[in-house]
Swiss-Prot record:
Keywords: Ribonucleoprotein, Ribosomal protein. One of its GO terms (biological process) is translation. SUPFAM superfamilies: Ribosomal protein L29 (L29p). This is Large ribosomal subunit protein uL29. NCBIfam families: L29. The lineage of its organism: Bacteria, Bacillati, Bacillota, Bacilli, Bacillales. GO terms for cellular component: cytosolic large ribosomal subunit. HAMAP family: Ribosomal_uL29. One of its GO terms (molecular function) is structural constituent of ribosome. Belongs to the universal ribosomal protein uL29 family.
Amino acid sequence: MKAKEIRELTTAEIEQKIKALKEELFNLRFQLATGQLENTARIRQVRKDIARMKTIIRERELAANK
């Protein structure tokens, strides 16, 4: 997901997506440990998406404090 798409979402929607991505990341790591994961790049992609979403939430918090 791109930052532009994330910025169009509300903070609550972003937090829901973060929760879903964290669950997916947990499952991907589990698959990696058991040798079932085929697309290892997906782990990195999910981590980056979570980081993007957290960054945008933080930007909104800082903007609200000014």
